[in-house]
């Protein structure tokens, strides 16, 4: 058989590729072309390569492209099997005068024909050809060679068919196909557009695995696409807007890509566009905001104008979509606009190194306020049947981001919406699994560092915590939250989240959002302790909360890197103990003693005596563990000292316990070893408050303080109340 005959036989693959979607019954195909059956029989009975080649040629001539239906293709496979194509793909001995790639082309053509059957496309004999098929994409050769072009087309046909099977993307990635596709695209040889299309499909199906296996090659493609995007002057720039989000890496985006992408977006969004042109650009900008925050936007006047333009366009789109009741909402576009609004909120509240100037911030806050009003209007229309929809979740998210920074504006509208928000958060909390699914669906459009994750089933509540923390300070909103049952929900939520930090759980893998959420819950409870003490006394959920705080603090204060959470727990527990002092759980039980011992440890270890060069006397200084977090901690520390002071007369066993811990003695010793000038007046007042209450509550405490030169120390620091107390018998 001649080389030309082999090439002709290779057209069988073409026929398979061009096969019509309609599949006539086999008996109809037979009656229309009875010769085909004889040739298929010859193919099955072929005894050597030459006979198989001849039979394939006869089959090819006997049928037209549209005549090969799925059943016929399957019968050809039954006659040929995989052994023959395998030999064609791997042979290194071609007939004289026949280029070896022609044999491989025939082998690939046969596979392409077989792969049009989904069952065969997932066959192990096809899957194990993935590595060799991938090499054909980057093989060098004459670009005008028809056989080579045919082989490239057939190769893409095979790989695309495999990608369409359930586990196909995983096999392609493992077989090196992603790198081969990247190289084929970057080489811009024949079929490079097919390489890009298949890459897009693989990234959409298995983004993480693709980047893990071929990050350098994918970054090279991103660089090429970004450069093309920056230079594009025709409609291709809008097509690239749709492609580029898929090629943004899960890690750092190269700076040169960011420059090109920002420049291209600035040119697009600065022009007058129709919605089909503008929307992909907004979605690309949202993905960049998600991946990089505002780092992709250059500093200076051009960058600030671009950011202001982004947020303006996003707010206009949100208002147009949500203000008109009954208007069809393009949820993917509006959710992308939410991400850009969140970027605007972050930049407007940033004090240092903000891209925006103050007049721009004022203007954007006003514009965003109107868009948030539209979001509230939309949420007011949401019925129970829509509460599990991802777009509702995204709308609550952007509202939560706004309320975390601004609660004074739109106060009436926010108060009217609070009952819905409490019910919505409760619904998702109680159906944690569904809430987790929702969070994963919208996570890619979030841009804050507290992106929802699988360890946080109560997403909606977490998103609302910062805003509720502000609102519980105000009488009106606080009354609504209490009436709707928010405190009870928050207690349950806190206890559930606390389980994630308990022994037996690996806290090193917890997202920061868990601890931040716990701290924010503590702040809300602190607000309620101060503004609604009656609620703490009468609601049983706070008794359960107190028990959890008492059980948890002893181990928490021993853990490295969790001092801020320990401060919140200690201070909240001390303040609640004053209100619940008559509770049996606080009457010197092991749990209560353990809690107060841990609270004393937290309060007593904040400061140390530190020697200073050239001075005979040490100064009072923060201990190393407290230095880095004191700015966030000091208010809690002073509040904790005040709360402990208030607990001493209410709990008779507390003063003897404090004496056994040697805190009063060590405190006086510390004050006696440092220069009084180094102790700030507010510190003196805090220390005196504790010492005075301990001295008043217990005679043994007074005696121990006198033995520690308490009267002299009180005189040095002008602690008149302590000096007077120690002078009493």
Curated annotation (Swiss-Prot):
Covalent lipidation (S-palmitoyl cysteine), chain numbering? 3-4
**SUPFAM superfamilies with a match to the protein in the record:** ARM repeat
One Pfam family matching this protein: Neurochondrin
The places in or outside the cell where this protein is found are:
Cytoplasm, Cytosol; Endosome membrane; Cell projection, Dendrite; Postsynapse
- In the record, Asymmetric dimethylarginine modifications are located at 75
List modified residues, type Phosphoserine. Answer: 2, 448
The UniProt PTM text for this protein says: Palmitoylated. Palmitoylation by ZDHHC1, ZDHHC3 and ZDHHC11 regulates the association of NCDN with endosome membranes. May also be palmitoylated by ZDHHC7.
- Topology with respect to the bilayer: Lipid-anchor
* InterPro entries (alphabetical): ARM-type_fold, Neurochondrin
Coarse class of the protein's main subcellular location: cytoplasm
- Where does it sit, as one GO cellular component term? neuronal cell body
**This protein's record includes keyword Protein transport:** no
Q: What biological-process GO terms show up in the record?
A: neuron projection development; regulation of neuronal synaptic plasticity
Q: Which residues carry this modification: N-acetylserine?
A: 2
- Quaternary structure (record): Interacts with MCHR1. Interacts with SEMA4C. Interacts with DIAPH1 (via FH3 domain). Interacts with GRM5.
Please explain the role this protein plays, according to its UniProt record: Probably involved in signal transduction, in the nervous system, via increasing cell surface localization of GRM5 and positively regulating its signaling. Required for the spatial learning process. Acts as a negative regulator of Ca(2+)-calmodulin-dependent protein kinase 2 (CaMK2) phosphorylation. May play a role in modulating melanin-concentrating hormone-mediated functions via its interaction with MCHR1 that interferes with G protein-coupled signal transduction. May be involved in bone metabolism. May also be involved in neurite outgrowth.
Q: Which family does it belong to?
A: Belongs to the neurochondrin family.
Tell me what this protein is called: Neurochondrin
Source organism: Bos taurus (Bovine)
Gene behind this chain? NCDN
